[in-house]
Amino acid sequence: MADAEAGKKIFIQKCAQCHTVEKGGKHKTGPNLWGLFGRKTGQAPGFSYTEANKNKGIIWGEQTLMEYLENPKKYIPGTKMIFAGLKKKSEREDLIEYLKQATSS
C-alpha cells in the first residue's frame, strides 16, 4: 500500500527544489502543483510551459503520473523538467499518494 509520509520525503528530496504544492503557492522553476489531479498538462495558471507540455493533452491522474514520473522526458519529449525520473514503482506510488493529499483540499 502506498505511503504518503514516505512520498512526502521523496517530494522534499527530489521535487521541492522546483515545485510547491500548497494552494496559492508560487511557481518556482516548475509549476505549483495545487489542483494537479484532473488538470490537463500545461495548464497551471501563470506558468510558462513548453509547447510539448501544452500539447500533450492528457489529464493528470494516478496512471498518467505513474508513467510520467518514471521517465518524464520519454513521456513528454520536449518538457523542460530536468528530473530523470523515479525508476522504483513503490517510490512513484508513495509520491503520488502524497501528491493526492497535498495538492487538494
Swiss-Prot record:
Any GO molecular function: electron transfer activity
Main location: mitochondrion
Domain of life: Eukaryota
Pfam family, one: Cytochrom_C
Modification after translation (UniProt): Binds 1 heme c group covalently per subunit.
Single GO cellular component term: mitochondrial intermembrane space
A biological process from GO: mitochondrial electron transport, ubiquinol to cytochrome c
Record: residues binding heme c: 15, 18-19, 81
Phosphoprotein as UniProt keyword: yes
Keywords: Apoptosis, Electron transport, Heme, Iron, Metal-binding, Mitochondrion, Phosphoprotein, Respiratory chain, Transport
Subcellular location as annotated: Mitochondrion intermembrane space
Similarity comment text for this entry: Belongs to the cytochrome c family.
Function: Electron carrier protein. The oxidized form of the cytochrome c heme group can accept an electron from the heme group of the cytochrome c1 subunit of cytochrome reductase. Cytochrome c then transfers this electron to the cytochrome oxidase complex, the final protein carrier in the mitochondrial electron-transport chain.
Annotated PANTHER family: CYTOCHROME C (PTHR11961)
Name assigned to this protein: Cytochrome c 2
Organism: Bos taurus (Bovine)
Encoding gene (name): CYCT
